[in-house]
C-alpha cells in the first residue's frame, strides 16, 4: 500500500492519502529557527534549541497534535473544516487533500464543499520566524462567505520540560495581549523592567507573536481554554463553531494565538493571507508584519529564494542511473536528510523531544561526512567546531553543548560536566571518527592547509589539526585493555555495549587501525618521518593482534568482556554473529581477501533479511553478560537483533570495496525508504527519510521502522553509495573513479562539482560487469588507470569511464 509518490522534478514527496500510518514529517528553517511539520500540520517550532527554545507546543507520540492549524468556516451553512485534513478530520469521501513536502517547505492542498485551499509553511531564508501562506479559491458557482481562523498554541516556557512537567511554575508566568493584527504571548511579563545581563533567577521577560497579514482581524482569542471550549478539542473548537472568537486573553494557565478574518469570495476568485509566528519583541514583530503588505508578492519571492538555496546545494552532485529509487534518494532525499542531521544532530524530531541539548560527538562528526561532497564549506565550519570540542587528552566531549565555549569547557573528568550533561565518561569511538571525516573533507576540497590550522581544545590549550589527530590516536593508545586492544569504555558506538576499562572492542580496534592508515598520509604530507615509522610499527602490531585475537574461523568477534570472555564467538548460544566487525574489517583494510569474502558471505547467510541486515544474531535473552544492555530491549528491536540502519551504509561500502556491485546495491534497496513506498503500511515511517532502526525477524512487526530523520544512517548510506556504488573516491591529488554497480546497469552519469571544476561523468558498462575499469578518458585524453589528477581537470571536464 502506498500513500503518495515522488515528484523528482520538483524535489517533493506528494502525500495523496492523509491517513498515513504515522505522522510523516518535514523540517523547516535553519539552525537559528527550526520547525517540524507533519502531513496533517502537527508539529512544533523552536529557536536554536529544541530543549531550551521551544515556541509552539507539541504532545509527543499522542495524536500528532497540536500544530499549525487553519480552520475554514462557511458562514451560511456553518460547516467548517481545516486546511490540513486534521484536526477537523472530514470524511475522506468528500474531503480531498494533498501534502507536498519539499526542501524546507510544506504545502497542503485541500478541496471541500466547493472551496480549494493551499497553505505553504516555510521559514524565510536567513530569518527567524515562520510563515503560513494561505490561498483560498471559490471553486463553486455562487458567492461564498467564509471565516478563516489561524491557531498557534504557545509553550508556557522556552524549556520543554518546564512547559510539560513543571506546571506549578509554568502555568503562572504567562499572559497574552492583542495588538492590532497580532497576539503577543509574554513569559515573565512582570520582569519587563529587567535588562539582559541583570536577570532575576536567570529569567527575563520573553515575547512571542502570532500575526495575520493580508486581511483585517475580525475576532481574536489568546486563551487556549476559551478557544477550544471545555470538553471540546482541536477538531471542534467552540471559537470556530461559533464563527466568532471570544476576545479572551490569557493571564496564567495556557496561552494561544487565534486570529479570525472574514473572506468574501466571488465564483472563481482567489484571496491570499498569511499567518506569522516568531519569538520577537513588539517593535521587531511589527516590522516583520509590515513586510507582508503585499502577501502574494512577498511570499512568492521568499519561497523562490528558499527553493533556490536548496536546489543550489543539491545540484553539486546529481546522478542518473537505471534505478529511480537510487536517484531519488541520492539527488534529493538522502542529501536533504544529511543536511537535517548535520544541522540538528539528534536534538529535535517527533521522537527526540529536545532533551539532548547539544551535539553528540560521534553523531555529528559522522553526520558531517554526508554533506562534504555537497557543501565542503559548511562541513569545514562544523569540523572546526567539533575539533574544538575535543579534550586536550584526545578524547571527545560525549555531548557538545549548543552554547559550547572552546577552551573553557568542563570534561567527563569533572563532576560538573557529568551533572550538567548526564554523560559520566568518555566513549571509546568518539574521537576516532575525526580521521575519516577530516580526510574526506581535505580530499574533497583540496584544502591541505587545513592540517596546519590551529584550533583550541575544549578545556584548555590549542594545537594544529594534525596535532589534534595525533592526540585522538594517543587517547586510544592510553586506553588499551589487557590484550592490547582498545578498551570499550562507556560505549563504542553501540551504546548497549558497556565494556568498561578492561573490556575490549574489536570494532574500535578496526577504527583504530583505519585511523593509523589515514594519519600516515597526513604524516607523509608533513614529512614527519619519525611519526610515520611509529605508525607503521604500531599498525603492524595492532593488525597482528586483531587477527590473532578476533578472527574466529569465518567471522570477526565483537570483543572481550571485562572478565575476559569472548563476545561473538561461533559457539555462543546468543549473539554469536555481529555485523559491524565484518564490514569494518573490510573498510579498515585489515581483512585479507579470504577473510573479507568469508565474513561478508556469513553476513549474507546469517544476518541479512529483506529489510536489511540485523545487528547481531541470535538476540540476547538468557545469556547476556553484565555489559550487554541490549537485553533490555525486546528481541528484534534496536540493538537487540534489530536492523540498525546506520550499519547498512557500512555494509554497502564494504561490499562495494570488494567489487560486489550486485550485493552492495541489494543492501541499498533493502533499506532505502524510496524502495519501500509501496510497503508504507509495513514500514510505517516516511518513505523519503531514513530511520534509526527497523524491527528484525524476531519481532512480530518485522519490517516496521522507527525514529525518523535524525539518524547516522543518512550519512553512512550516502557515503556507501557515493564512494562505494558510484565509486567517487577523491584523495589529496585528484579523484579515483571505481564504481561497484549492478551488472545489469548499461551506464550511468554523474554531474559533480569538484574543487571549483564541473565534472560531467559518463560510466559505460558494455560487458555488464559489477566493477573494474577498462579505460578512463578525461576530455578525450586516455588516463593511465581510473585516476584523474586534479591538474587534468578543466572548468568543464568531460569524463568517460568504460568498465570491464
Regions found by a protein language model. Give the residues of each.
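Anionic coordination/interaction segments
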Residues: 1-362, 376-389, 440-445, 525, ...
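Aromatic-rich carbohydrate-recognition surfaces in CAZymes
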Residues: 71, 359-364, 368-379, 383-483, ...
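Catalytic cores of carbohydrate-active enzymes
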Residues: 151, 165-166, 397-398, 513-630, ...
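Extended, well-ordered alpha-helical scaffold segments
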Residues: 287-297, 301, 305, 329, ...
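Carbohydrate-binding/catalytic loop surfaces
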Residues: 349-358, 399-426, 458-464, 483-505, ...
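Surface beta-strand/loop "capping" patches
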Residues: 730-761
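Short, well-structured beta-strand segments within conserved domains
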Residues: 751, 792-804
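Short strand-turn-strand beta-turns centered on an Asx-Gly dipeptide
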Residues: 778-781
Amino acid at each position: 500500500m502506498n500513500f503518495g509518490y515522488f515528484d523528482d522534478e520538483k524535489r517533493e514527496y506528494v502525500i495523496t492519502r492523509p491517513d498515513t500510518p504515522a505522522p510523516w514529517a518535514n523540517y523547516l528553517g535553519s539552525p537559528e529557527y527550526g520547525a517540524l511539520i507533519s502531513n496533517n500540520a502537527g508539529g512544533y517550532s523552536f529557536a536554536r534549541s529544541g530543549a531550551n527554545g521551544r515556541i509552539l507546543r507539541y504532545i509527543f507520540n499522542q495524536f500528532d497534535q497540536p500544530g499549525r492549524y487553519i480552520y475554514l468556516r462557511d458562514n451560511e451553512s456553518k460547516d467548517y473544516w481545516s486546511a490540513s485534513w486534521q484536526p477537523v478530520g472530514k470524511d475522506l469521501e468528500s474531503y480531498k487533500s494533498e501534502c507536498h513536502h519539499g526542501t524546507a517547505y510544506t504545502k497542503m492542498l485541500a478541496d471541500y464543499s466547493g472551496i480549494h485551499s493551499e497553505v505553504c509553511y516555510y521559514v524565510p531564508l536567513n530569518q527567524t520566524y515562520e510563515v503560513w501562506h494561505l490561498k483560498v479559491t471559490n471553486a463553486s458557482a455562487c458567492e461564498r462567505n467564509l471565516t478563516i481562523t489561524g491557531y498557534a498554541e504557545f509553550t508556557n516556557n522556552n524549556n520543554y520540560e518546564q512547559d510539560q512537567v513543571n506546571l506549578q511554575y509554568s502555568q503562572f508566568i504567562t499572559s497574552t495581549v492583542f495588538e492590532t493584527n497580532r497576539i503577543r504571548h509574554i513569559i515573565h511579563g512582570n520582569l519587563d523592567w529587567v535588562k539582559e545581563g541583570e536577570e532575576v533567577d536567570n529569567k527575563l521577560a520573553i515575547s512571542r507573536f502570532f500575526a495575520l497579514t493580508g486581511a483585517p482581524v475580525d475576532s481574536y482569542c489568546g486563551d487556549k481554554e476559551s478557544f477550544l471550549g471545555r470538553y471540546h478539542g482541536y477538531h471542534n473548537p467552540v471559537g470556530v463553531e461559533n464563527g466568532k472568537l471570544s476576545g479572551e486573553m490569557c493571564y496564567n494557565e495556557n496561552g494561544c494565538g487565534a486570529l479570525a478574518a472574514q473572506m468574501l469570495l466571488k465564483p472563481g476568485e482567489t484571496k491570499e493571507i498569511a499567518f506569522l509566528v516568531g519569538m520577537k519583541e513588539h517593535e521587531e514583530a511589527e516590522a516583520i508584519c509590515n513586510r507582508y503588505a503585499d502577501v502574494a508578492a512577498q511570499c512568492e519571492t521568499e519561497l523562490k529564494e528558499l527553493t533556490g538555496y536548496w536546489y543550489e546545494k543539491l545540484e553539486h552532485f546529481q546522478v542518473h542511473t537505471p534505478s529511480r529509487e537510487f536517484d531519488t534518494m541520492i539527488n534529493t532525499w538522502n542529501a536533504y536528510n544529511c543536511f537535517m542531521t548535520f544541522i540538528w544532530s539528534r536534538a529535535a524530531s517527533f521522537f527526540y523531544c529536545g532533551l539532548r541539548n547539544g551535539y553528540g560527538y560521534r553523531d555529528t562528526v559522522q553526520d558531517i561526512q554526508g554533506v562534504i561532497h555537497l557543501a565542503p564549506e559548511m562541513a569545514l565550519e562544523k569540523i572546526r567546531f567539533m575539533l574544538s570540542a575535543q579534550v586536550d587528552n584526545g578524547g571527545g566531549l560525549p555531548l557538545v553543548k549548543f552554547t559550547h565555549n572552546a577552551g573553557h569547557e568542563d570534561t567527563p573528568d569533572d563532576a560538573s560536566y557529568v551533572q550538567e550533561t548526564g554523560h559520566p565518561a568518555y566513549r571509546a569511538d568518539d574521537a576516532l571518527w575525526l580521521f575519516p571525516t577530516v580526510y574526506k573533507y581535505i580530499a574533497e576540497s583540496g584544502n591541505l592547509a587545513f592540517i596546519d590550522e590551529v584550533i583550541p581544545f575544549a578545556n584548555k590549550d590549542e594545537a594544529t589539526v594534525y596535532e589534534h589527530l595525533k592526540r585522538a590516536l594517543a587517547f586510544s593508545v592510553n586506553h588499551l585493555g589487557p590484550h592490547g586492544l582498545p578498551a570499550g569504555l562507556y560505549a563504542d558506538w553501540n551504546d548497549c555495549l558497556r565494556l568498561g576499562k578492561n573490556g575490549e572492542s574489536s570494532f574500535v580496534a578496526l577504527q583504530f587501525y583505519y585511523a593509523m592508515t589515514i594519519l600516515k598520509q597526513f604524516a607523509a604530507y608533513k614529512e614527519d618521518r619519525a611519526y610515520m615509522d611509529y605508525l607503521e610499527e604500531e599498525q603492524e602490531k595492532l593488525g597482528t593482534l586483531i587477527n590473532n585475537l578476533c578472527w574466529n574461523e569465518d567471522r570477526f568477534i565483537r570483543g572481550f568482556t571485562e572478565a575476559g570472555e569472548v563476545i561473538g564467538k561461533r559457539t555462543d548460544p546468543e549473539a554469536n554473529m555481529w555485523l559491524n566487525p565484518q564490514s569494518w574489517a573490510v573498510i579498515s583494510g585489515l581483512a585479507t581477501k579470504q577473510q573479507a569474502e568469508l565474513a561478508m558471505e556469513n553476513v549474507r547467510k546469517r544476518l541479512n533479511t529483506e529489510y536489511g541486515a540485523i545487528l547481531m544474531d541470535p538476540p540476547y535473552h538468557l545469556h547476556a553478560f553484565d555489559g550487554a544492555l541490549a537485553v533490555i530491549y525486546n528481541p528484534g528491536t534496536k540493538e537487540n537483533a534489530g536492523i540498525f540502519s546506520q550499519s547498512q551504509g557500512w555494509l554497502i561500502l564494504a561490499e562495494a570495496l570488494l567489487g560486489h556491485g550486485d550485493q552492495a546495491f541489494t543492501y541499498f534497496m533493502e533499506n532505502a525508504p524510496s524502495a519501500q513506498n509501496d510497503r508504507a503500511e509495513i514500514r510505517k515511517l516516511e518513505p523519503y527519510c531514513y530511520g534509526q532502526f527497523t524491527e528484525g525477524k524476531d519481532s512480530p512487526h518485522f519490517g516496521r521502522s522507527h525514529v525518523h530523520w535524525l539518524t547516522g544512517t543518512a550519512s553512512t548510506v550516502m557515503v556507501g553509495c557515493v564512494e562505494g556504488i558510484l565509486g567517487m573516491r577523491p584523495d589529496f591529488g585528484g579523484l579515483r573513479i571505481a564504481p561497484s554497480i549492478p551488472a545489469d546497469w548499461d551506464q550511468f552519469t554523474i554531474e559533480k562539482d569538484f574543487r571549483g571544476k564541473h565534472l560531467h561523468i559518463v560510466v559505460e558498462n558494455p560487458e555488464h560487469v559489477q566493477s573494474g575499469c577498462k579505460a578512463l578518458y578525461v576530455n578525450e585524453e586516455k588516463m593511465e588507470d581510473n585516476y584523474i589528477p586534479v591538474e587534468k581537470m578543466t572548468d568543464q571536464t568531460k569524463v568517460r569511464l568504460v568498465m570491464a
